[in-house]
């Protein structure tokens, strides 16, 4: 096991072979990397019951330090995150959505806002919200060094024909900057959990996973509660589970891969995209904290209006056809995945026959 120790403390202790130093025991390594600490491996350690109120830690370990077990941590990397927001007539929620991003403590990101032919004022409100953010940034502008000039954070793309969320996200890929490392999806009626959401994401990206599954919360009747924390142990559990687009951060090269693009012109577009992403990923990590808030109070959301939306029934049929196509594409490559897709085909076919949707 590897744990962290402050470098200055090490310098004090290493001259005395009999000297012990206290080490953080239950802090994630990713959290400590940002502090530019060093770490060491240990063999014989004992628990020390002491309350370190300054660090909010109740239990720490102590260990003898030697030069042999001294290891330097890898450099902390600030990955650029491309946040994709599809929008259609969400003038009442888009400001809250964008504000939750602009207030982030982690700032190495860009937003691709793709409007799917809205007829309301959502584009105007998005521009006004961004302008308000820019004015705040300019208030801290350093006229001498010019080091504080805010970078462009928001790109607005207006579609010329209706493509729904899947098409909007595919279009967004074409507008991502070349230096974007990962993509994350935020719906225009939802928002990020708190101001450290992107910081938490970047800490977990230090191991360079293809996919990072994140925790979700839901907002309903004025209350926010945690509703989904990923617990996948392997690729098969991830495929068999279901994480909507907003439940994962994906390496840009994987998300934009031809085989992993969204189906367009249909609802439920993220179900098969999830399967494809999980099939082609080589590694993943879990962030067992809420990062995203799913707004279940929104009367216009897809899942809320599914019973009266004429697209819902046709999308169930389309989903069955897309699942069949996915099964035929992947069949024979992995026996466990074959069985999962076969059972999924049966389930979706039953949905078509019963005009229902058991997944919801």
What residue spans do the PLM features occupy?
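Nucleotide-sugar donor-binding/catalytic module of glycosyltransferases
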Residues: 1-10, 17-46, 52-318, 329-332
């Amino acid at each position: 096991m590897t744990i962290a120790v402050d470098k200055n403390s090490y310098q004090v202790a290493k001259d005395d072979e009999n000297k012990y130093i206290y080490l953080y025991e239950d802090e994630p390594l990713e959290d400590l990397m940002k502090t530019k600490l060093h770490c060491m491996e240990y063999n014989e350690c004992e628990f020390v019951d002491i309350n370190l109120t300054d660090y909010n830690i109740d239990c720490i370990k102590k260990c003898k330090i030697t030069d042999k077990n001294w290891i330097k941590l890898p450099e902390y990397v600030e990955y650029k995150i491309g946040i994709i927001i599809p929008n259609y007539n969400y003038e009442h929620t888009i400001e809250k959505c964008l504000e939750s991003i602009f207030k982030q403590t982690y700032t190495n990101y860009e937003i691709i806002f793709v409007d799917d032919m809205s007829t309301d004022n959502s584009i105007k409100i998005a521009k006004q919200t961004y302008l308000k953010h820019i004015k705040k940034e300019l208030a801290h502008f350093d006229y001498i060094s010019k080091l504080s000039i805010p970078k462009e954070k928001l790109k607005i793309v207006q579609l010329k024909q209706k493509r729904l969320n899947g098409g909007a996200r595919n279009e967004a890929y074409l507008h991502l900057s070349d230096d974007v490392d990962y993509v994350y999806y935020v719906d225009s009626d939802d928002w990020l959990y708190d101001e450290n959401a992107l910081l938490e994401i970047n800490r977990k990206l230090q191991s360079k996973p293809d996919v990072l599954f994140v925790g979700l919360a839901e907002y309903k009747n004025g209350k926010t509660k945690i509703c989904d924390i990923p617990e996948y142990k392997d690729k098969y559990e991830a495929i068999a589970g279901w994480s909507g687009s907003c439940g994962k951060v994906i390496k840009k090269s994987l998300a934009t891969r031809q085989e992993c693009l969204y189906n367009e012109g249909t609802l439920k577009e993220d179900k098969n995209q999830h399967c494809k992403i999980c099939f082609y990923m080589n590694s993943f990590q879990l962030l067992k904290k809420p990062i995203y808030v799913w707004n279940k109070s929104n009367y216009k959301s897809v899942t809320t209006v599914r019973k009266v939306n004429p697209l819902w029934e046709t999308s169930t049929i389309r989903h069955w056809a897309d699942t069949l196509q996915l099964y035929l594409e992947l069949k024979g490559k992995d026996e466990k995945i074959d069985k999962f897709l076969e059972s999924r085909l049966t389930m979706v076919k039953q949905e078509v026959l019963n005009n229902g949707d058991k997944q919801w």
